[in-house]
Amino acid sequence: MKFSENWLRSHVPIQATRDELAATLTAIGLEVEEVIPLGESLGQVVVARIVEAMRHPEADRLQVCSVDAGQGELLQIVCGAPNARPGLVAPLALVGAKIGELTITAAKLRGVASNGMLCSAKELGLDSDAAGLFELPDDAPVGQALAEYLGLPDASIEIKLTPNRADCFSVRGIAFDVAAACASEVVAFDAGAVAPVSTRTLAVELDAGKDAPRYCGRVIEGIDPAAKTPVWLAERLRRSGVRPVSLLVDITQYVMLELGQPMHAFDLDTLHGPIGVRRSCAGEQLALLDGRQVTLDDSFLTIADAGRPVALAGLMGGLDTRVTETTRNVFLESAYFDPAAIMGRGRKLGLHTDAGHRFERGVDPALPPQAIEVATRLVLELAGGTPGPVVHAQLPQHLPQPARILLRRARIARVLGIQIDDVDVVRMLRALGMQLDAVAEGWEVMAPSRRFDIAIEEDLIEDLARIHGYDRVPTTLPGGASRIAMPSETQLDELSVRRQLVARELQETINYAFVDAALLERWQLTNGLVPLANPLSAELAIMRPCLLPGLVATLGRNAARQAGRVRLFELGKVFAAAADAGAAPQESQHVAAAVCGDALALQWGEAARKVDFHDVKGDLMALAAASGAQLEFQPSTQPFGHPGRSADIYRDGVCIGWIGQVHPRLAKALDIDVDVIAFELQLGPLVQRTLPCAGELSRFPSVRRDLAFLVPDEVSWAAVSASVRTTVGPLLREVQLFDRYVGQGVAPGFKSLAMGLILQDNSRTLTDRDVDAVVTDVVAVIEREHRARIRS
């Protein structure tokens, strides 16, 4: 946003110097990128009129001009500008004037005396236009100092706006922030209604719903087509980076820069029937002001009359309905469009306009009626004409409504770390145009309609911090006591789990929390899935229901790259759809491991062998031992597991996971040609541990008895050991499985389990009779409950 310093000061009277103003703007978040001083050294430059222009006798491109500079006699000036002509009013630098680094002196050019220099806008440092002399209006007072005539000195200030500050795309919007920061007040603005003189109107229809909820239009007839843009208006535009075009166009640009409301002027005689806002039809064509013919789709908003689109709403007017040097009747448009309806439409067509930039960020929905009155007043003042009544069409239900926000004193102090006096809070917020009502906790605040960025309490606090001054917030070091968190005695932390698995020679991996739906179908995991609304890609469209699919896929990629021994683990969240529709998905923390290849690293002391179920179960049992968890294993029916080499994992009777070999059919589908052994279980139940209780150490010796049973294949060791513990009771210190045998001497369908019973009493030495009685009971129970028999 570029603007004139003097224009800003006309809206907010402040005593700050130019440098102080620039520093203030940057301090309140309106970062100043450039300040260009204008007219600093034009003391001897005056308004002059060329009375006569003759061709230079020695140079085809030079003219010898007789110039009236208001000094009573004509001055002879040699000039090479292509637009030098009799009657032209232009700036004249007198002898002795300093223009930039050049001091003007009397000189001879190709043998002809020249007593000054007629100047272009670029030579004066007022504009980049160097094509010819700076043409001034014909009624400019000859002899008057140019600086006085143009309202100089001045400066062109350019600021960089953040996307949330669309309200500062206007001089008046910036003025509110400056007034608040400088403890001043914004000058009252006259936007009173202009009384209609005629009854001529143009009907307005709104057919775009919430995308265009407000549209104002006014007919002005009989304007003077020869009226020119006055120098004060043209200079304000020029210093704001806008090149003057024609009076009507310049007025709409002026209103946009001053108030922030983009406008458009149509030649009324080119419009047919009612005008309105509607969606474009696919394939519809429109000739734009820049001469391009564009083909529209149905995503564009258009301004249309009874038979055709006449403008791209919020972006650019149409070529066929533009105002020209012959326009006598005009229709002024001022509207509010929803930012989402304009956003991105210009880029589709390669357009970037000031109007589109403002509408994309958000324009004050209350501005259209004010802007059309201001524009009307300027048209009548500068070009005459007869105004009709304003036609105001709106859909109130779709207009943004400012919210009332509770601003608490305590919250201000908590967020900023400083206490701001109530009187300063009220002064700053009112200077920003906000309405305040005092309440017990602080204030109820309603932001002005131009402030789209004010939605919550913290937005108001941010404004207070900006205006109060970030440099006035004291620098303090963080305080407070540091508390050392004691490690939980009832739960193993995740770091300990990681360390335990690393100690077992597993390497941690981190995979995406999103997986491919096709991969889950291969694993036959299709229930309770959580799809993503906006996935990164089609292959990452589902939140993972478990860790194993991603972990095994990673293992497969490593195995395919000649890794002979792969041992991976992962800790992470898994996700499941909630039972109640509409509820948030359920999250839980899991731990998983997957291994393949050699059981041990290659060495001379151990024979090479492949990893098997019992190796991975050993890793799991070591992990469980860290928390004291007593795990049980039962045959699993999971479809992704090998039917004879997988088990469900239980703790305290609750299934918490799975361990086993990945089904060969699944491994083949995943292009993995080695056996993969894996486990996954819920982390929460695994890491819970019971506080150890100190018990009495027996002073009496323990006794060991070894027993071997022939049991059916389907009977698990877990079931047998549970029967032993229940039968023996407190005398049992430990039961150990030290042999499992299937083969010669054992009938088909049976297996031999050899166990060691370690018995001990705290009060006496066990006798042979005591031990024999226990053994007898154990044998009887196992034979009865498990159809087993003692092996001789």
Curated annotation (Swiss-Prot):
Its cofactor is Mg(2+). HAMAP family: Phe_tRNA_synth_beta1 (MF_00283). It is found in: Cytoplasm. Mg(2+) binds at residues 453, 459, 462-463. Residues 698-791 form the FDX-ACB domain. This is Phenylalanine--tRNA ligase beta subunit. It comes from Xanthomonas oryzae pv. oryzae (strain KACC10331 / KXO85). Residues 400-475 form the B5 domain. The lineage of its organism: Bacteria, Pseudomonadati, Pseudomonadota, Gammaproteobacteria, Lysobacterales. Residues 39-147 form the tRNA-binding domain. GO terms for molecular function: ATP binding; magnesium ion binding; phenylalanine-tRNA ligase activity; tRNA binding. Tetramer of two alpha and two beta subunits. Keywords: Aminoacyl-tRNA synthetase, ATP-binding, Cytoplasm, Ligase, Magnesium, Metal-binding, Nucleotide-binding, Protein biosynthesis, RNA-binding, tRNA-binding. It is an enzyme of class 6 (ligase). Signal peptide: none annotated. Its EC number is 6.1.1.20. Belongs to the phenylalanyl-tRNA synthetase beta subunit family. Type 1 subfamily. One of its GO terms (cellular component) is phenylalanine-tRNA ligase complex.
